Amino acid sequence: MASIGTPLTPTATRILLLGSGELGREVALEAMRLGVEVVAVDRYPNAPAMQVAHRSHVVSMLDGAALRAIIEAEKPYCIVPEIEAIATGTLLELEQEGYRVVPTARAARLTMDREGIRRLAAEELGLPTSPYRFASTEEEYRAAIETVGLPCVVKPVMSSSGKGQSLVRTPADIDSAWAYAQTGGRAGAGRVIVEGFVDFDYEITLLTVRHAGGVTFCDPIGHLQKDGDYRESWQPQPMDAVALEKARAMADAVTGALGGWGIFGVELFVRGDEVWFSEVSPRPHDTGLVTLISQNMSEFALHVRAILGLPVPLLRQNGPAASCVILAEGDSEAPRFHGVDAALAEQDTALCLFGKPEVHGRRRMGVALALGDDIDAARAKARRAAGSVTVEL
């Protein structure tokens, strides 16, 4: 893109965000720094990205007709999905009609559930993955466990943030894992994936940027998961040189198959110099929030540059860095944060509070960010900062 218009005028360069959570908010802010007009869409009002966007719409993004009506009215330069739960059939139609979907409508479709992307990675591209089977009924599920063996991981094919996910260690866990998967998926009861457990040393997110100038890899991000959801991340994760080369080759293959420009969060398991593909998101990744402090350009800045066709120069690491999630649990429609002063008292710390308007159950409300002399020091500092913040519900 050689030129950018002025927001709220006939020359505006407009992007439309589908999903307006914390990741969408950061994308919106980076786009607005470049003078881009931002329209935010989500299923609930006052979502984080809506609080900073030029305009917003509240609609179920699984309602294809409603989604089409908004897109046809807004006529965006590009449509930027931030979540998986979207009427991807409608996106495919709109792309065929000339609308641009980031990175592509096919990528949005394949990654909206675990089956599409696993079949692409393992069966079409031949990438190493854990053994797996898909099941639609309880009978198929039990047969899948028999084939894959114990221990194994059971997940709804459509879910996020660990919802519906269980580790099945013994036969006593089989019934409860099926029941949880049937209630925890985005589409309610439905199909599951049964994955063999990989005995890995660590897992990483390899942020991969496909842009007009080629492909750029961020340094690998290590992360800690609890109940299937991200709790901490750090960068750079030390890696064997052979493993890093394999990881980059896998990331290049899967993102190349998905196509388009933008940032992709490629999740991989690593043991020694062995690497297994796990999942990919064709958008900024929650573990990549650490790049708000770790790099000269965050994953959000990189995403916006890539989708606008702007240059992505050499990335610079600011030093060992870490993030730690700030959680709240309970019910509230007006959360308040305490201890912000204490959290920011240490040198080289920062907070990113998401501005989520409600809490019902457990919800990620922000992250603490820190630089340190090494990864352990950065992680400890980020944990201290996060621990200083309490959320009043």
Curated annotation (Swiss-Prot):
Q: Which Pfam families match?
A: ATP-grasp, PurT_C, RS_preATP-grasp-like
Subunit structure of this entry? Homodimer.
| Positions bound to ATP | 114, 155, 160-165, 195-198, 203
Catalysed transformations (reactions): N(1)-(5-phospho-beta-D-ribosyl)glycinamide + formate + ATP = N(2)-formyl-N(1)-(5-phospho-beta-D-ribosyl)glycinamide + ADP + phosphate + H(+)
Which residue ranges does the record assign to the ATP-grasp domain?
Answer: 119-308
What is the protein's known function?
Involved in the de novo purine biosynthesis. Catalyzes the transfer of formate to 5-phospho-ribosyl-glycinamide (GAR), producing 5-phospho-ribosyl-N-formylglycinamide (FGAR). Formate is provided by PurU via hydrolysis of 10-formyl-tetrahydrofolate.
Report the sequence similarity comment from the record.
Belongs to the PurK/PurT family.
Name of the protein described by the UniProt record:
Formate-dependent phosphoribosylglycinamide formyltransferase
